[in-house]
Every structure is written in C-alpha cells, then in structure tokens.
C-alpha cells in the first residue's frame, strides 16, 4: 500500500499543498526549519490522528488558520484505493473520515495506513519508560492479530473497574471476583498474542540488525508483567493489600516490557546514540517485514533527519534495507545530494524541495 496523493492545509508553517508522491522513495530536502518535518507530521496525523511532535494538536494548527486538514488517497495492496481525511479546529473538534464516512476511532485509520516513524527521538524506545516499548509491541500485534483490539478493549475495561474499586471500594465481593476473572482471561489472551508476536519478530530483528551493525550478544526478551511461573489470579490475590494501598493494579499486561540487553547490561546503558538508533531502525524494519508477510501490504516509513548520528556507511545500509522492503518511504534531510544517488535504477524516487513552508517537486518519479 502507498499514498498516491496527500493534501495538507493549515499544518504548522506549510502552505496549502497537494503532493503526488512516489510509491517507493520520497526525499524532502531543505534548510532546518523549512517545514520538512511538518510534512511527515501531516502524514502521521493522517494515519494515527496524533502528532509525534506534540501531545496536543492545537500547536499543529497554523496560527492564522481556524483548523488543520489532511486528506490522502491510499492505493491498497489488494487493489483499489481508500480516501482518508482528518481535521481539527481550534475549538477541539476532531473529525476522521474514511471513504466519505465518519470513522469511529483512530484505529480504523491505523489499520488502513500503518506507519512507522524513525526520527531523532527514536532512541527513547530503548532509554524511555516501559510504556513506549509496550506501544511498540502492541503496534505490531495490532497489525498481525485480528483479535487483539477486541481483547485489548476488554482488558482496559476490566482493569479500569478493578482500579476503581481498589481506590473506592465500590464493588461487592461477587462483582470483584467477576471483574478479576475477566481481567485474568483478557490478560492471558494479550500475553499469548504478545508472546507469539515476539517469537516471530526476534529472528527477523536479528537478521535485520546484522545487516546494519555488528552487536554480538544483543538479546531481545519479553517480560509479560507478572511472574511467568504463576497464574495472574494468584499474583492478584497475594498483592491485593498492597494494590489497595497503591490504588492501582501492579501486576498484569499493563506492566509488560521489552528488554534489550548486551551481555549482562541494559543495552541503552552502553550503546552509543548511533548504535541505539540502528537497533531501533532494525526493530522497526523487522516490524515492517512481519506486516508484509501477514497483510500482503507494506507499512509506510517516515524517516526524519536520516543522517543524524549515523556515518555514511550506516546511512547507506539503512537506505538499502528500506529499499529492499519495497515499501513507501518519506525521508527528510538538509542536503539531498547524498540521498539522491545510490538507489536501484528501477526504484522510483521523487524529490521535494521545502523552503519556508513551500513545497516544490524537483524530480518526478514518473520521469
């Protein structure tokens, strides 16, 4: 799948524009602050209904505009296309449209337009809180396991009920037991989905990493959020008093984590920023491989500031892997000379110059 058309209005400093990107490689180049990252942000908004630069959408709206809007036409892997649209105004109204109909949730966007982001903050996947790694893990599970979303919603509902009575004691014993059973059932299913996903991801990740950098002894493991030797029901019963003191459930899939270690050490503690970025790139490219195997369609990669913290050899290796995925890629850089060359002759490459929010296509992939 790929975006064949993108229209952007009212996003940051960007002038209104309609782009016809290449189905493969798209390079956006220009000076820092010109608006390159805002193009990626607009595509991210279209696919996830969130910005990767701000937790709020109000700053995304151009200061002279009442709202921001992004439309896109997605060419589907199975044939045909789907039209997506998102808009957000200054009063907080947010609208998602899919093929002319209002969508129920952002998950519907994500299902049609799976996106992967690689940017200067990527190292947070290793250094950041477990929540970031759970989001990475569950993105992958969501795209390969059709039952995940329904089970996830059941888990969240049961967890919310249990945490509420832990804080307020509002449920009788029978209701407490019923919600505990529901929580344990949903937790076991989520754990099963995640374990199966990690089992499939690990060999692909290891192979991908070996093509980017040699890090002998790096291991990827999964912690499910409670003792692997015990049933969750047993753990919940034994920790009930402390859970009541804390006001929330301390064990379960909401505490899961991915652990990357180099020998006996946490990988984030001893890898350089450049090495961390390569590890994260390998993880995200491995996810793309799994999506293509299961869905017959590729995810789209948004790569912001590719040269950052990577030398020429590693940049070339990363570009080669992205090209081999045969997916659509949007890459930003200051100087396009390095990225303009080196692609296979049959790979369609489009170049876009971004200057003070204006975007000009300088090389058409159809030429």
Swiss-Prot record:
Function: The RecF protein is involved in DNA metabolism; it is required for DNA replication and normal SOS inducibility. RecF binds preferentially to single-stranded, linear DNA. It also seems to bind ATP.
InterPro entries: DNA-binding_RecF, DNA-binding_RecF_CS, P-loop_NTPase, RecF/RecN/SMC_N, RecF_2
Superkingdom classification of source: Bacteria
Residues binding ATP, per UniProt: 30-37
DNA-binding among keywords: yes
Name under which the protein is recorded: DNA replication and repair protein RecF
Subcellular location: Cytoplasm
PANTHER family: DNA REPLICATION AND REPAIR PROTEIN RECF (PTHR32182:SF0)
UniProt GO molecular function: ATP binding; single-stranded DNA binding
Stored Gene3D superfamilies: P-loop containing nucleotide triphosphate hydrolases (3.40.50.300), RecF/RecN/SMC, N-terminal domain (1.20.1050.90)
Alphabetical GO biological process terms: DNA replication; DNA synthesis involved in DNA repair; double-strand break repair; SOS response
Keyword terms: ATP-binding, Cytoplasm, DNA damage, DNA repair, DNA replication, DNA-binding, Nucleotide-binding, SOS response
HAMAP family found in the cross-reference section: RecF
Organism listed in the record: Pseudomonas savastanoi pv. phaseolicola (strain 1448A / Race 6)
UniProt family annotation: Belongs to the RecF family.
Pfam family, one: SMC_N
Keyword hit for Nucleotide-binding: yes
One GO cellular component term noted in the UniProt record for this chain: cytoplasm
